[in-house]
A protein has these predicted regions:
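Active-site-adjacent beta-strand/loop module that shapes the phosphate/pyrophosphate-binding cleft
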Residues: 87-110
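N-terminal strand-loop-strand
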Residues: 6-51, 55-56, 77-78, 101-103
Length: 149
């Protein structure tokens, strides 16, 4: 039975409350000087360029997930991981937690199973098609850090 005022269901026989499970996911926008790294994901139907993202693994901190996903998806090392904000994704029961990070080292080497292309975009570069502000936290993250001349 749904419990009024709470996000849980309670068994009428034993009183056990069951709360929905969430799958935490991270998103990170990497900065290098006055440029940001944007990527186009292979599974994206929108063809937007956006920040890197991925799910946490069991036993992993969110910060460790940022470092792991960045290295796995584009072969880069980052530092100065800073919280930006979060957004619930009720379908499929996720919580997207967004960060910024600063580039340390490496050359872009995409994992072709996840990333179609990735590149640095600075203030003098034509800016790619990115998620709009109202669609997701990605749009807000990118616009807040979009390189300006």
């Amino acid at each position: 039975v749904h419990v009024a005022g709470e996000r849980c269901a309670r068994c009428p026989a034993c009183g056990h409350s069951a709360y929905p499970r969430i799958s935490p996911a991270m998103m990170v926008l990497i900065r290098r000087g006055n440029a940001i790294l944007l990527a186009r994901h292979t599974q994206s139907p929108t063809r937007f360029f956006t920040a890197l993202a991925g799910f946490l693994e069991a036993g992993e901190s969110i910060e460790d997930a940022v470092h792991r996903e960045v290295f796995e998806e584009v072969g880069l090392k980052v530092t100065n991981v800073q919280y930006f904000g979060s957004q619930p994704w009720p379908f499929p029961h996720s919580l997207m937690i967004a960060f910024t990070a600063d580039y340390v080292s490496g050359e872009i080497r995409v994992d072709e199973s996840e990333i179609a292309e990735a590149a640095w975009f600075g203030p003098d570069d034509p800016f790619p098609h990115v998620p709009p502000l109202g669609l997701s936290i990605a749009g807000h993250l990118i616009q807040a850090h979009r390189p300006r001349a």
